[in-house]
Amino acid sequence: MPNRALITGASRGLGLALARALAADGWELVVDARGEHDLRAATADLGPAAAVHAVPGDVADEAHRLDLAAAVDALGGGLDLLVHNASRLGPSPQPSIAMYPLEELERVYAANVFGPLRLTQLLLPCMGPDARIVSITSDAAVEPYEGWGGYGSSKAALEQWTRVLAAERPDLCVYVVDPGDMRTQMHQDAFPGEDISDRPLPEASVPGLLTVIEGDLPGGRYEARTVVPAELATGVAP
């Protein structure tokens, strides 16, 4: 039976790049994104229909989270990997924290903190020993960048509950991974009107993510572009 992963936010950017890499390695995938058309178009070339299960919806929505859990349960055999990649930036341009609309902040936290936590709660029963959970974070979670109070604080909260989960569930492999700046639509939205063509494509962060997913690294926080290659992490020669 192939390994099975659930990746949120897989219609573009890092989520899609990771989905492509895992599909190429023979993983069975359950993927989601807010836009149904974009999700199905993006995942059409990932592999046989039986190996890629697209479930469109918003991770901030409880009904959608239940749909994702039901999709995994219907496949049988449990879940080997859960990647919390979907996220919401918030207003663009990003407001100062003193002027941040609380209703917008609630939406950011619903997508970046509460949604992933609730999805984890729903999926833990089908994750066996050594299953992996990866929460995608940002340097804005640890650095006080002006204008990043909403998104950054939500990623800090995501990191903290992920690390607490790692302490509470030592039978699982739980990671926080910062992919670094990437040439994505979200990054462009964070810097409206600026040229971001010097940022690496999301694919540049995938090898490091695969090291975390397929290697033997201890749980913790990693930067995707600075982790060692997977064959070195596992001690297997290339």
Language model segments and positions:
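Conserved glycine-rich cofactor-binding loop
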Residues: 11-12
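Conserved glycine-rich Rossmann-like NAD(P)H-binding loop of the short-chain dehydrogenase/reductase
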Residues: 25-42
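The beta1-alpha1 cofactor-binding region of Rossmann-like NAD(H)/NADP(H)-dependent oxidoreductases
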Residues: 56-68
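Active-site Tyr-X3-Lys motif and surrounding loop/helix of classical short-chain dehydrogenase/reductase
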Residues: 67-71, 93-99, 103-110
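Hydrophobic positions on the long internal alpha-helix
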Residues: 83, 116-123, 127, 161-162
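Catalytic loop of short-chain dehydrogenase/reductase
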Residues: 88-89, 96-102, 117, 130-157, ...
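C-terminal helical subdomain
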Residues: 172, 176-179, 184, 192-236
